Amino acid sequence: MAKKMQRRRRQKRTRSQRGELPFSLVDRFLREEFHSSRLSSSALSFLTSVLEYLTSNILELAGEVAQTTGRKRIAPEDVRLVVQNNEQLRQLFKPGGTSVNEDDN
């Protein structure tokens, strides 16, 4: 009697699980805020990767600022200092008028 070969089916994995990126958050934000229904998954993947890259770099630099001032936590002022002192980040955030609120603690 021949043994029947059983195929093991892989469980479906979401884009977030495969890429370890928060696609669903970016997708929902873009669709709600900009009413965009023409977003491809590759566009979401690219945008999410760019946002993650920028965030990690800013937080790394802000962590160094906090550490040099003898603190263990990153404060909003550390993020603001990083953006102000880095020419590329300053240019990136300049057109949109994005700023860090100094009153947040």
From Swiss-Prot:
Give tissue specificity per the record: Testis-specific.
Compartments annotated for it: namely: Nucleus; Chromosome
Q: What is its main location?
A: nucleus
- Single GO BP term: cell differentiation
Keywords from UniProt, A to Z, are: Chromosome, Differentiation, DNA-binding, Nucleosome core, Nucleus, Spermatogenesis
Q: Please indicate if the UniProt record lists Amino-acid biosynthesis as a keyword.
A: no
Q: Name one GO molecular function term.
A: DNA binding
Tell me which InterPro entries the record gives. Answer: Histone-fold, Histone_H2A, Histone_H2A/H2B/H3
A GO cellular component annotated for this chain's UniProt record is: nucleosome
What Gene3D superfamilies does the annotation carry?
Histone, subunit A (1.10.20.10)
User: PANTHER family recorded for this chain?
Assistant: HISTONE H2A (PTHR23430)
Membership in a protein family = Belongs to the histone H2A family.
* Function noted in UniProt: Atypical histone H2A which can replace conventional H2A in some nucleosomes and may play a role during spermatogenesis. Nucleosomes wrap and compact DNA into chromatin, limiting DNA accessibility to the cellular machineries which require DNA as a template. Histones thereby play a central role in transcription regulation, DNA repair, DNA replication and chromosomal stability. DNA accessibility is regulated via a complex set of post-translational modifications of histones, also called histone code, and nucleosome remodeling.
Provide the protein name: Histone H2A-like 1
* Native organism: Mus musculus (Mouse)
